[in-house]
């Protein structure tokens, strides 16, 4: 007869990461202005521009690296196209979006493990 006991083995790596970083996530979320009563349209546009300035170069570097682990569905997780679409909303055209400043202090993406770590952080 098969046992119906729940597996009580060691937590998965993902569970350990979530547990180990949960307080940091809470602290970070408290600093983000998304739900601030003071966030106006101009502030939201600047926030989108800042996110684009980070996500566009890091996603480009990730996908150009050729080191993303097999089986990772990038189409479901890429954020840059959505940010571009959202930036069109307040009237920015593609030329203005392409001229936005980009983050140049990117992490090294020279191993599959480094790429996986960055993908984990980007996923939030």
Please report, for each region that a protein language model flagged, where it lies by residue:
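Metal- and O2-centered redox machinery and metal/ROS homeostasis
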Residues: 1-124
